[in-house]
């Protein structure tokens, strides 16, 4: 009678797949519960209504003036987008960035790619900075902090194309610096196509291609993941890894790369399975800590 031998690695792989399947089912159940929360019949507290709801009133015999309401709405929109002269611009900007961060997390949880979200967010921040932090020519850097409260009359000047280009570059740099994570380095080295840098990144990734790294899961636990599970070519992984802030500079210096951070970045942008399993907030903190630790070495 013949005996059937089962490879232990196949058993471990099957158990890992079962664990991932259970976590996926838990995630789907939580999403269903969240989407049906409005059907549970929970009462609405009057105190929790938005502030504008208290201004609404009903008239029995008069129809609302639609023209007046549209003008009021436009004025309200402009007030929300532009800063009041008496308010601190730094506090408003910080509040705006907090809202941007919340929006990024929501979009990432919905399955959108991080790079697409980030490019759109940068453009929005640039628009915000351009409107609320004007940079008129002829001002010194010392009185930039008082430019929002100054009452001096504006002088009409004809700006040259080179001046407009420099101002747009300054606003873009300001937005990237202010909106990016605090310790991430936005440098030109990340955009260099240096073959030696790509070779160094590919070499370090290839050495740890099958090594499994720990990542936080949505079920308040951890799961293991490696580069091999991405099902991507090494060239594509290297191309995506060069977008991680600071990685190109570390590779150029021959330093050790934060491979767990690189794997999390690439997987979050290319693997739907990884997006379903990972806890985005904890992952961002882990990636930031890895970058800080390797950059300080």
Curated annotation (Swiss-Prot):
Phosphoprotein as UniProt keyword: yes
Keywords: Chaperone, Cytoplasmic inwards viral transport, Host cytoplasm, Host nucleus, Host-virus interaction, Inhibition of host innate immune response by virus, Inhibition of host interferon signaling pathway by virus, Inhibition of host STAT1 by virus, Inhibition of host STAT2 by virus, Inhibition of host TBK1 by virus, Inhibition of host TLR pathway by virus, Interferon antiviral system evasion, Microtubular inwards viral transport, Phosphoprotein, Viral immunoevasion, Viral RNA replication, Virion, Virus entry into host cell
Record-level Gene Ontology MF annotations: RNA-directed RNA polymerase activity
Ranges for region Disordered: 57-82, 132-189
GO cellular component: host cell; host cell cytoplasm; host cell nucleus; virion component
Stretches for region DYNLL1 and DYNLL2 binding: 138-172
Residues spanned by motif Nuclear export signal: 49-58
Function: Non catalytic polymerase cofactor and regulatory protein that plays a role in viral transcription and replication. Stabilizes the RNA polymerase L to the N-RNA template and binds the soluble protein N, preventing it from encapsidating non-genomic RNA. Also inhibits host IFN-alpha and IFN-beta signaling by binding and retaining phosphorylated STAT1 in the cytoplasm or by inhibiting the DNA binding of STAT1 in the nucleus. Might be involved, through interaction with host dynein, in intracellular microtubule-dependent virus transport of incoming virus from the synapse toward the cell body.
Family, similarity comment: Belongs to the lyssavirus protein P family.
The record's account of how the chain is modified after translation: Phosphorylated by host PKC and by an unknown kinase.
Compositional bias per record (Basic and acidic residues), positions renumbered to this chain: 71-80
Keyword check for Transcription: no
Disulfide bond annotation, renumbered to this chain: none
InterPro entries on file: PP_M1-like, PP_M1_C, RABV_P-like_C
Polar residues biased stretches: 158-180
GO BP field: microtubule-dependent intracellular transport of viral material towards nucleus; symbiont entry into host cell; symbiont-mediated suppression of host cytoplasmic pattern recognition receptor signaling pathway via inhibition of TBK1 activity; symbiont-mediated suppression of host JAK-STAT cascade via inhibition of STAT1 activity; symbiont-mediated suppression of host JAK-STAT cascade via inhibition of STAT2 activity; symbiont-mediated suppression of host toll-like receptor signaling pathway; symbiont-mediated suppression of host type I interferon-mediated signaling pathway; viral transcription
Record PTM Phosphoserine, positions in chain: 162, 210, 271
Protein name: Phosphoprotein
A Pfam family annotated for this UniProt entry: PP_M1
Extent of motif Nuclear localization signal: 211-214
């Amino acid at each position: 009678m013949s005996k059937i031998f089962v490879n232990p690695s196949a058993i471990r792989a099957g158990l890992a797949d079962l664990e991932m399947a259970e976590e996926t089912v838990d995630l789907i159940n939580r999403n269903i519960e969240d989407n049906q929360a409005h059907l549970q019949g929970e009462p609405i507290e009057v105190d929790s209504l938005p502030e504008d709801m208290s201004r609404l009133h009903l008239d029995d015999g008069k129809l609302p003036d639609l023209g007046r309401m549209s003008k009021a709405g436009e004025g309200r929109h402009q007030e929300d987008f532009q800063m009041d002269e008496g308010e601190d611009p730094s506090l408003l900007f910080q509040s705006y960035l907090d809202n941007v961060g919340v929006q990024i997390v929501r979009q990432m949880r919905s399955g959108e790619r991080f790079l697409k979200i980030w490019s759109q967010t940068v453009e929005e921040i640039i628009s915000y900075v351009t409107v609320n932090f004007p940079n008129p020519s002829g001002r010194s850097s010392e009185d930039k902090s008082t430019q929002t409260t100054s009452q001096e009359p504006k002088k009409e000047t004809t700006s040259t194309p080179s001046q407009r280009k420099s101002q747009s570059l300054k606003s873009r740099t300001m937005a990237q610096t202010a909106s990016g994570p605090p310790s991430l380095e936005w440098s030109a080295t990340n955009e260099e196509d240096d073959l030696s840098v790509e070779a160094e990144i590919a070499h370090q990734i290839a050495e740890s291609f099958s090594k499994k790294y720990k990542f936080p899961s949505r079920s308040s636990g951890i799961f293991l993941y490696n580069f091999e599970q991405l099902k991507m070519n090494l060239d594509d992984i290297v191309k995506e890894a060069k977008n991680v802030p600071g990685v190109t500079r570390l590779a150029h210096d021959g330093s050790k790369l934060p491979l767990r951070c690189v794997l999390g970045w690439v997987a979050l942008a290319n693997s739907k399975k990884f997006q379903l399993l990972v806890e985005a907030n904890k992952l961002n903190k882990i990636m930031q800590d890895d970058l800080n630790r390797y950059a300080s070495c």
